[in-house]
Every structure is written in structure tokens, then in C-alpha cells.
Amino acid sequence: MPPFEVKIEKLIYGGDGLAHHEGATVFVPFVLPAERVAALPIEQKKKFIRAQPETILEASPERIAARCAHFGVCGGCNYQHIPYSQQLEFKAEILRETLRRIGRIDWTGAIATHASPPWEYRNRAQWKIRPAEGAALDVDADEDDARQEAGRAKKEQAKLNIGYFRANSTALCAVEDCSILAPSLLTALLALRQALARGALPLALREIEVFGAEATAASPAKL
């Protein structure tokens, strides 16, 4: 299905924009309400379409430049194109709609938001490990079987990369930096990248989940 134009009606839980096209509900990430978008379908069902924003045809005046170079490809976060104060407003409205739609609670009162720092706040992450894009094995055919197998494993492991899944995909988005990770977790991510490059991690490893506590005078950083 070729790209088609939609106008984003609102944001929903998870950060996707919601629109409609020829009777189908359309979900598009990394957009804002009232934006006109050329949407490229990546999954099509009878009643809904998941799409990627191929082009922002008419941008919201609220849109800002994302801090992270991976934003728009990486599926690790959804709101960097929105000012932080407005992110909180959208999330409060999403909660209000969820209460109404699922809980049958029509809450018209204020919803207090508890803001955290907009950057370097995430102290839990799930990183995926997959072969680097374009990686191919190159093992000397003259080596004996044992050495060849060891060399193959070492080279294959060294060509793995670490990051997050791409948005709406199970393909890897390898990252060298992450603006929302707590500093202790970013340090761990970079150390794991180096360990992969050395072939120092188990070949079968495909996912790492981490939880970090930031260092204080009374409590050193731990992972």
C-alpha cells in the first residue's frame, strides 16, 4: 500500500497519533494533533493500519527538534518532539480518556502531574542484542575444525550490537547514546558495547534488562 495523507486527531496511550483513512483507524508514532502527515503503512488489518510518518506535510507549531539522533527510528521513547510541559498535558488527557473509555469514569476534575527531569531519568531499561547491520562471518577455511568453530563464534559475537527495537519493529536500532537514560545506565550500555566488540559476552545473549540507582554520597551507583 502506498503512502497516504492523514490528519492526526489526537494522541493515544503509548504516544501514537490516531487518525482515520478510508474507514480504518490509523496509528502513527512521532506526530502531534492537527498535523498533516504522509503515512507509510507497515501493518494493515481489516480495521486498523499501523504506519510510519514518511513526511510531515504540515507541522504543529508546538513541534520541537528532538535531542536524540535516534529519535524517530528507535522505539525506546515517543515524545521528544513535544515540549515537556505539553507532554504532561497530553498524558493527563490520555489518562482522562482511558478512565472514560475503559473504567466508565467521566472525570472532569484536575489531574495532578508529578514531573520528573525530562532527561537522564530512566533507571530501568531493556536492551536487545542482535547482529550488526550487514555483519557477515569471515573465518579462515584452512583452520582445523575446533579452531574454526572457536573463531567463528568469536567473530560472530564481536559483530553483535546493542540497542532498542526500532519503532513498531523487531529490528535493532543500535545506539551509542541515550538522552533519557540515567548516567549509571548509560555507562553500563557503553561498557556492554565494548564487551560485545571484544567478543567477551555469551554468543546466545539476546536481551539484557537493567535497573540502576544513581550514586549519592551515602550510596554508590550500583547495577
Predicted regions and their residues:
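Accessory RNA-recognition modules of RNA-modification enzymes
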Residues: 1-223
